[in-house]
UniProtKB/Swiss-Prot annotation:
Keywords: Membrane, Mitochondrion, Mitochondrion inner membrane, Protein transport, Translocation, Transmembrane, Transmembrane helix, Transport. It comes from the Eukaryota. The gene is timm23. Component of the TIM23 complex at least composed of timm23, timm17 and timm50. The complex interacts with the timm44 component of the PAM complex. It comes from Xenopus tropicalis. This is Mitochondrial import inner membrane translocase subunit Tim23. One of its GO terms (molecular function) is protein transmembrane transporter activity. Belongs to the Tim17/Tim22/Tim23 family. It is found in: Mitochondrion inner membrane. It holds the Pfam family Tim17. One of its GO terms (biological process) is protein import into mitochondrial matrix.
Amino acid sequence: MDTNHPGSAGGRGGLGSIFGGGSPGYSHSDLAGVPLTGMSPLSPYLNVDPRYLVQDNDEFILPTGANKTRGRFELAFFTIGGCCMSGAAFGAVNGLRLGFKETQNMAWSKPKNVQILNMVTRQGALWANTLGSLALLYSAFGVIIEKTRGAEDDLNTIAAGTMTGMLYKSTGGLRGVARGGLAGLALTSAFALYNNWEHIKGSSSRLSL
């Protein structure tokens, strides 16, 4: 049976046109005239060399000129949520410890269970609120400093931590502001030092050589 008969081709074209699947046919002579300049010899089906598609590290889909690192605003949600959950977990453990300590002379009964549960709930909420508030202030200051300076580095971290401590302890007067600022400065400086420890070690080793 000859499948190249015009009638059979017309029948297939008619069915294809009915169901919307019809497509024009191309002969080998038509395809032979298509230019293949610029195509890779490794893959005739791509207009780029597949070797350029192999990446040694992770790549992100970003607009041209965009920064690959997440900014302060993107990290703020993770920071605030993580601090709230960490504070709740720490407060629950601390409340459990305090509850057992305060009820150690009581017999194991329902009032003892209620008192321990109340202590766990109270301490969990207290620590979650405290750490969440600190994270909110730190993130807000970090975003403001980043937008003002137009850069994201360890100086933003230290400045945001110092200002957070100062504002959080502002109700204690000038002495409280100074203590809060020093505490924030110390914590964020230690964090920045930890993040850059490998770089500092590498720089010191190169200088020693």
